[in-house]
C-alpha cells in the first residue's frame, strides 16, 4: 500500500464512503487538537495508560479504532515506549483530514483511513483494542481481538459536556 506523504495509508474502499469526505473535516480536526492540547482530557489519557500498562505484555499489538486526531493513541504509545514496552500500534479513522493531524502527532504509529465496521486487519491480531468516543462495532472488534485480549471502551456519561449544553440550550 502507498503511504501518503503525511504518514497515513488510505484503506477506505469507495463502497464504504457514505459522503464525499466522511468524518471530521480539517477545521474540526484543528479544533479538537487545540482543545485536547489544553489538558482537559489528560486524566482520561493517564487512566487509559495505567489500564493498558497493567494489562500488556512486553510488545503489545494495539489497535485504536476511531482514533480521531490521535491524542489517546499517541499518548498510550509514548507511555508504553517509556515503560520499556514498545507497542506495535495502529490507529484507524474514517476521516482523511483528521488522520493527517494524527500522523503529525506521532510517526511511530501506523495510521489508516478505514471504517471501524470493516477494519483492514487480520483476525485475532490485537492484544488490546481501544475505542474512545467512537462508534461501537462489536462484531468487527471481536474478529480482530486476540482470544484473551482486552477491549477498552470509553463512552460519554450523562453529564458529558454539561456546561457546554447549558450555554447552548439556555
Could you describe each region identified by the protein language model?
Residues 1-21:
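N-terminal auxiliary segments of SAM/dcSAM-dependent transferases
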Residues 18, 23-47, 51:
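Class I SAM-dependent methyltransferase Rossmann-like catalytic core
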Residues 54-61:
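Short helix-loop-beta connector
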Residues 61-63, 69-118:
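Class I SAM-dependent methyltransferase SAM/SAH-binding core
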Residues 117-129:
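A short acidic, Gly/Pro-enriched loop at the edge of an enzyme's catalytic core
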Residues 126-140, 155:
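A short SAM/SAH-binding and catalytic strip from SAM-dependent methyltransferases
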Residues 138-150:
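A short glycine-rich, Lys/Arg-flanked "PGG" loop and its adjoining helix->strand segment in the class I
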Residues 150-170:
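Conserved class I S-adenosyl-L-methionine
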Amino acid at each position: 500500500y502507498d503511504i501518503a506523504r503525511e504518514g497515513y495509508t488510505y484503506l477506505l474502499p469507495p463502497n464504504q464512503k457514505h459522503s464525499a469526505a466522511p468524518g471530521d473535516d480539517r477545521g474540526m480536526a484543528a479544533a479538537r487538537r487545540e482543545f485536547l492540547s489544553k489538558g482537559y482530557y489528560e486524566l482520561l489519557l493517564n487512566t487509559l495508560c495505567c489500564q493498558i500498562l497493567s494489562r500488556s505484555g512486553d510488545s503489545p499489538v494495539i489497535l485504536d479504532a476511531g482514533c480521531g486526531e490521535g491524542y489517546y493513541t499517541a499518548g498510550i504509545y509514548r507511555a508504553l515506549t517509556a515503560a520499556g514496552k514498545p507497542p506495535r500500534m495502529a490507529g484507524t479513522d474514517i476521516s482523511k483530514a483528521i488522520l493527517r493531524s494524527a500522523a503529525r502527532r506521532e510517526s511511530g504509529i501506523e495510521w489508516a483511513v478505514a471504517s471501524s465496521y470493516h477494519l483492514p486487519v487480520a483476525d485475532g491480531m490485537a492484544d488490546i483494542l481501544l475505542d474512545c468516543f467512537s462508534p461501537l462495532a462489536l462484531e468487527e472488534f471481536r474478529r480482530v481481538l486476540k482470544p484473551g485480549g482486552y477491549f477498552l471502551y470509553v463512552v460519554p456519561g450523562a453529564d458529558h459536556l454539561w456546561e457546554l449544553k447549558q450555554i447552548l440550550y439556555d
